[in-house]
Structure formats: C-alpha cells, structure tokens
A protein has these predicted regions:
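Catalytic cores of the polymerase beta-like nucleotidyltransferase superfamily
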Residues: 1-427
Length: 427
C-alpha cells in the first residue's frame, strides 16, 4: 500500500522470527489482551486500548487431504524470511519490512512488479489454495494491474470445483465493492479460466446486439461497461451496493436465451424475464443470502421498466408506478437502469442526463412511493371492527380494496373504510 500510494490499512500483520509461540505469547501479554483463537494456525491477536494486531510465526503447510481444510500447519521460528514469503500468493504481497534493521525485505521483486503494474504469483505454493485464482481476479481490478501470462497459465490449471461458495462470494464481494473498474477483474476471469465455472457469464461472450443501440459490441462488452458505470454510482451502503453491482453483473443474463435476428436486426424481446432463472442459478452457487438473491432477481426482471415507463408516460397511470414500487425500491432500480443506459458508447451530451430516471423518481416522489411501496389502507382489523366474521371473504375484500388503492381511487383510511361500508351493506 505504501509503495502504491494507497491508504494504509489499520490492520497490521507482524511476522515474528526467532521466538517460539510460548515466548511470543509471553511478550505480547505485557502490552494487552492476547487472543489465542488462531494459535493452531500460528497466529496470535493482540488487543490494546487503541488497536488490534495480528502476530504470526513463519509457517509451512503440509497437505493432508482435499479442499482448503486439507492441510496441517507447522510453525518454524528458525525459517528464513524468503522461505516464509515463498508461500504468499503474489509478489506484491510477499514483501516485508524489518523493523530492527529498518530495511525493506523483497526476495521476489515485488517492487519491480509494482513499478510495472504486474500481478505475478510467487511460486509453486500458489497452488496450495485455489481460491487465489479468485484473488487474482479481484486484485487485478482493485490494483488495476495486468496479470502475468505465467500466472494466468498456472491459474487455468487449478481445480476450483471444491472451493466453498462462501469463500468465492467474498472475492466477488471485494471485486464489485472495492474496485473502481470491476470490469478489469471480470475480463481477467476469462483469462484465468474462472468462466468455465460460471456458464451464465461465459454465455454472454459473442451474443450480438443491435449496433444502433449498442455500438460497443456484444453483451459481454456491454456488461463490462455497465459494471464500471454501476461502480461510479455506488452509495457506500454495502447492502444497497451489493444489489446494484450484482444487478449490473446479471442484468442481461437473459440475452443468450432470447436474442434473435428479427425484422432486420438483433432483438432480445424477453431478456428481462428470461434472465431470472440464470440469475438465480448464478447467485445460489455463491450465497444463501435469500434477501440479496430476491432483490437482485427483482432488479434483473425490472431493469427495463424506467425507460419503458418513460416512453409510455402519456399512456400509463400512477397505479403502474405504485405496483412497481411493491416489487423493487425505485431509487435503487433507477441506479441500475442508469448504469445500463450509460454502459454504451454515448456522446458527451447523451451522458449528461438520464431523463427516464429523473422522470420516474419525480413521479414516485409525487405519489409518495419513492422510499417504499404503498401499504394497505384497509386491513382485516377494520373489517372485524365493522362486524364482519373471520373468513376468506375478508381476504377477497382486502385484495379488491388494495387494487383500488393502487389505482388511486382510495387515498386515506377513511375513504377505504367508507368504500367497504358502501359496497358491503351487511357490515
């Protein structure tokens, strides 16, 4: 971080040579509370009133079985720094600083790779954890480094099929939330062989688009551009940004299924709804976060609506927008639609304004559904209070009342109750 002029992380990792685990623990206890939860991995955490630090002993890993848990940790205080650094993933992460000698330790020429903006693996130990392929993907984007040809070739040989989805998801999370240009990492995923494990992404490559609307090229190229535009629209609120960025990544998953050459040009008439199934399949292999999956699939399904509604604004009523607000949060949808709109080759003037989004946001604010969908005015408790007996008829009345509310015919609780009384005289 120092040599790349990046913000220095508050998380400090200190590797200690020449002390046993017991000796290290004894020394650290003089400065604060020591947590030994990572002791079996050769790591101790020191907590002081002002900060937390990770102290570790040099270690080597002995493979004992398959998967990322199939190894045994052996600490060795007598190990040289070069040998300890040889098990790191990339040369830029293999450097150290000798606090006693006040010198940089760089046995694998990480500084040279930083100068040339190159991401290069340290050595054969890279293969010990195939997750490093995904780390290459997200690091290449966050650092905006080019992956060396030798590293890419090495990555393509590794088996990624046994990696737990939680670990893969974390690398995707870092890619889409921390990189200014996530497209660099997505492009790298093609080079690294990652796309072989994600057919929904691979299917985007080569899918044609109408050059009138998409002069940038195929769906893959468009998706890369949309991803970068979405990154510029991130809010800093992680949950919202996750939905936006995964929505950008998945928004055109339906195009490989729906694209046809019709009436003289390439069209994808149902790609919004066709994208739901591949989006579900993709996300369920990454996470069990049902709320995230639900929100992203809804965004994919509705991503065309802002422009569609704007084009039909003289023919639609406010009920259409109220119903949309029940399915997605409108400001979030507008961000995705804006990224989709901007993710093309546009003139400077065309980029200045997303008129459809501005219009929809103003309409949503006007009818009070900008922040959430409308809540029913008439509820079961009102009908029971009016003397109606519990039963399925209550549900039918409430459903009809809510439809009238969405259409704008009922706007207050009093109007809703009055409507129920006048239409159901037995109440």
């Amino acid at each position: 971080d120092h040599f790349m002029d990046r913000r220095i992380s508050k998380d400090l990792d200190v590797e200690v040579f020449g002390l046993s685990m017991q000796e290290l623990e004894s020394v650290l206890q003089k400065f604060g509370k020591v947590h030994a939860a990572g002791k079996s991995f050769g790591v101790l955490k020191l907590k002081t009133p002002t900060a937390e630090y990770d102290f570790s002993l040099p270690r080597r890993e002995q493979k004992t079985g398959k998967g990322h848990r199939g190894f045994k940790i052996i600490t060795d205080p007598a190990m040289s720094f070069k040998e300890a650094a040889s098990r790191r993933d990339f040369t830029v992460n293999s450097m150290g600083y000798d606090l006693l000698e006040n010198t940089l330790l760089d046995p694998f020429e990480g500084i040279e790779d930083i100068k040339h903006k190159k991401l290069r693996h340290v050595g054969p130990a890279f293969a010990e954890d195939p997750l490093r392929v995904f780390r290459a993907m997200q690091f290449s984007a966050r650092l905006e480094f080019k992956i060396s040809a030798q590293t890419a070739k090495f990555c393509r040989k590794l088996d990624l099929s046994e990696l737990p989805r939680e670990r893969i998801f974390e690398e995707f999370r870092k890619l889409i939330l921390k990189a200014k240009r996530p497209s660099i990492g997505l492009s790298a995923s093609k080079q690294l062989g990652v796309l072989n494990y994600f057919p929904e992404l691979k299917a985007l490559i080569g899918v044609p688009q109408d050059p009138k609307w998409h002069p940038e090229g195929d769906v893959w190229t468009h998706t890369l551009m949309v991803l970068d535009e979405a990154a510029r629209l991130r809010t800093g609120i992680e949950k919202k940004d996750m939905v936006l960025m995964f929505g950008a990544l998945c928004h055109d998953f339906g195009k490989p299924l729906s694209t046809k050459f019709l009436r003289g040009r390439w069209r994808s008439p149902s790609h919004d709804t066709d994208g739901i199934a591949p989006t579900l399949h993709f996300l369920q292999r990454l996470t069990d976060d049902r709320d995230l999956i639900k929100q992203v699939t809804s965004m994919v399904k509705e991503h065309l609506r802002p422009i569609q509604l704007f084009n039909e604004r003289d023919r639609i009523n406010s009920g259409t927008i109220r119903r949309l607000a029940l399915r997605v949060r409108i400001p979030d949808l507008i961000l995705l639609a804006k990224a989709d709109y901007l993710g093309r080759k546009l003139t400077k003037k065309e980029r200045e304004c997303f008129e459809a989004g501005d219009w929809l946001l103003a309409e949503a604010e006007r009818i009070n559904v900008k922040d959430e969908g409308p809540r029913p005015l008439l509820m079961g408790k009102h009908l029971l209070k009016l003397g109606m007996s519990p039963g399925p008829e209550i549900g039918n009345i409430l459903k009809l009342a809510f439809e009238k509310q969405l259409n704008g015919d009922l706007q207050t609780n009093e109007q809703a109750i009055s409507w129920a009384k006048s239409n159901y005289p037995d109440l």
